[in-house]
From Swiss-Prot:
EC number(s) reported in the record: 1.1.1.95
Induction: Up-regulated in the aerial parts by dark treatment. Not regulated by high CO(2) levels.
Name assigned to this protein: D-3-phosphoglycerate dehydrogenase 3, chloroplastic
Pfam families: 2-Hacid_dh, 2-Hacid_dh_C, ACT, PGDH_inter
GO cellular component: a single term: chloroplast stroma
Pathway: Amino-acid biosynthesis; L-serine biosynthesis; L-serine from 3-phospho-D-glycerate: step 1/3
Natural source organism: Arabidopsis thaliana (Mouse-ear cress)
Top-level taxon: Eukaryota
PANTHER family assigned: D-3-PHOSPHOGLYCERATE DEHYDROGENASE 3, CHLOROPLASTIC, FORMATE DEHYDROGENASE 1
Presequence positions on this chain: 1-38
Start and end residues of each ACT domain: 516-588
Residues reported in the UniProt entry to bind NAD(+): 195-196, 215, 274-276, 300, 324-327
């Protein structure tokens, strides 16, 4: 039997994959993917599941049909680490921190962590993957509850409900102080048009509000279907009377609401956040409230939870605050308990988990052979989606694998998953892997098709090149379009290094590392020198340059690899070169 391979030796942590011996999943002989194999436990062979925070009774009852359930609440870290070595699964909400020390203390027995809710900020995913522990969540059951809470905060804020309630309970009768604003005819900008955002939009429409939304990857027809207008981020925040945040917390959205964005808003705007605390720069919001740019804010989530006792934002008279109650309805908590219980039980049985957020198991030999192609597939997906004009909505992706191998000798499921990961994960809080990629793509309305191009020659390399096309979208870089109008990028592995070899109709030779500037230009002498000079003057290190052209003296595309992101001023200088017709900066 082949030995298990430490993932860190062949993949970066972002790939979120672990391996299993080849005898468990021999290629082309068994297509089922074994996620977890439950070891023998006490209690007549039943696994043991530890629940550390209150879970709906329906979920507990479901767990007890399959496992021995230990409900131990308010455990210290030391107590949790002591108990965990006797448990096969752990179920938590947001209050239990599941860090590396917990996985180390489990001594390899802990196989599944279930998060009763959506966010997994309190679980160390890297450590979970390293220790071979699957992490699942319950992302759907609390959608309606979160949307209802968002609307409740919206209306309570507009009519000063919390402040008026506190006043009358203090024995006062000050009606004039709490004159509110009407919602009818006002513009609500919903930032993030996922499940919760779209439900908030539906309800706001019912209140007579004009609803606009910004989500760069939401299809416009999906928004139109419920009477919502899809607009740019700048239009959304500058025209809204109310803003409701429904964004995942990612590197791109962290502190998205800051001094700069507040300055772009209407004076007197009102903001609701039932998403993630970190999307708002809380110090900047406090300044915006004090200056009157933001008239009121209604917050259910905070950067640090619970907030400190004397938190100025919570105490501000224009802020309505609740202690992370978005999912706190009896119905939602029962639904979440059932959803997480089903996911944990299924994982312990070795079934596929559509809500897995870190790591399925795949054959060792497949990982070894496809390692550079996995990186190539993800980078091509990431590059292609950055070429899409915001608001176009990605709904049709085609992946082509050119190979001299027979179709049944090339397992592309992992590559397909990584293309999806590259396209969706940068703009989502969802972690994409082999298990949940198709599920997430379908959920977001993205249709993925694949085709094989059989080449003549030796099957020494599993794949000669991979092509990713995105159809029915507008491109930020017109030269990336194929003859049929699709965004098209193509790449291959050269000496173990993933490389970009084609953009649209133009051939290039670009190592897919760092970042790249693509420029379309008139093919004439001196262009490389002009661009290199601008970058050098701004201390931007150039790692490579490549030029592809249709014919001498006609159009050409130049690809410039850079180690860091140039400033806007630097990019403008490049764009101002007369012979350059268009350019785009892409993070790889």
């Amino acid at each position: 039997m082949a030995t298990s391979l430490n993932l860190s030796s062949i993949f970066s942590s972002s790939s979120r994959l672990v391996t299993t011996p080849s005898s468990v999943f021999p290629i082309r002989q068994r297509r089922r993917i074994i996620l977890v194999t439950s070891s023998s436990s006490g209690g007549g062979g039943k696994p043991t599941i530890l629940v550390t925070e209150k879970l709906g009774q329906a979920g507990i009852d479901l767990l007890k049909k399959y496992a021995n359930v230990d409900c131990s609440y308010d455990l210290s870290l030391e107590e949790l680490c002591t108990k965990i070595s006797l448990c096969d699964a752990l179920i938590v909400r947001s209050g239990t921190k599941v860090g590396r020390d917990v996985f180390e203390s489990s001594r390899g027995r802990l196989k599944v962590v279930g998060r009763a809710g959506v966010g997994i900020d309190n679980v160390d995913l890297a450590a979970a993957t390293e220790y071979g522990c699957l992490v699942v969540n319950a992302p759907t059951a609390n959608t309606v509850a979160a949307a209802e809470h968002g609307i409740a905060l919206l209306t309570a804020m507009a009519r000063n409900i919390a402040q008026a309630d506190a006043s009358i309970k203090a024995g006062k009768w000050t009606r004039n102080k709490y004159v509110g604003v009407s919602l009818v005819g006002k513009t609500l900008a919903v930032l993030g048009f996922g499940k919760v955002g779209s439900e908030v939009a539906r309800r706001a429409r019912g209140l007579g509000m004009h609803v606009i939304t910004h989500d760069p990857y939401a299809p416009a027809d999906r928004a139109r279907a419920i009477g919502v207008e899809l607009v740019s981020f700048e239009v959304a925040i500058s025209t809204a009377d109310f803003i409701s945040l429904h964004l995942p917390l990612t590197a791109a959205t962290s502190k998205m609401m800051n001094d700069v964005t507040f300055a772009m808003m209407k004076k007197g705007v009102r903001i609701v956040n039932v998403a993630r605390g970190g999307v708002i720069d809380e110090e900047a919001l406090l300044r915006a409230l004090d200056s009157g740019i933001v008239a009121q804010a209604a917050l259910d989530v905070f950067t640090v939870e619970p907030p400190v006792k004397d938190n100025k934002l919570v105490l501000h008279e224009s802020v309505t605050a609740t202690p992370h109650l978005g999912a706190s309805t009896m119905e939602a908590q029962e639904g979440v308990s059932i959803e997480v219980a089903e996911a944990v039980i299924g994982a312990l049985r070795g079934e596929l988990a559509a809500t897995a957020v870190n790591a399925p198991m795949v054959p060792l030999e497949v990982l070894r052979e496809l390692k550079p192609y996995v990186v190539l597939a993800e980078k091509l997906g990431r590059l292609a989606v950055q070429l899409v004009t915001g608001g176009s909505g990605v709904n049709a992706v085609k992946v082509t694998y050119a190979s001299s191998r027979a179709p049944d000798d090339l397992d592309t499921r992992l590559l397909r998953a990584m293309v999806i990961k590259g396209i969706i994960e940068p703009i989502s809080s969802v972690f994409i892997n082999l298990v949940n990629s198709d599920y997430i793509a379908k959920q977001r309305g993205v249709k993925i098709s694949e085709e094989r191009m059989v080449l003549d020659g030796s099957p020494e390399n599993p794949i000669e090149y991979i092509t990713v096309r995105i159809a029915n979208v507008e491109s930020r870089f017109a030269s990336a379009l194929s003859e049929s109008g699709e965004i098209k990028v193509e790449g291959r592995v050269k000496q173990g290094v993933p490389s970009l070899t084609k953009v649209g109709l133009f051939g290039v030779d670009v190592s897919l590392e760092g970042s790249v500037i693509l420029c379309r230009q008139v093919d004439q002498p001196g262009m490389i020198g002009k661009v290199a000079s601008i970058l050098g003057d701004e201390n931007v290190n150039v790692s490579f340059m490549s030029v592809g052209r249709i014919a001498p003296g006609k159009q050409a595309v130049m690809a410039i690899g850079v180690d860091e992101q140039p400033s806007k001023e630097t990019l403008k200088k490049i764009g101002d070169i007369p012979a350059i017709e268009e350019f785009v900066f892409l993070k790889l």
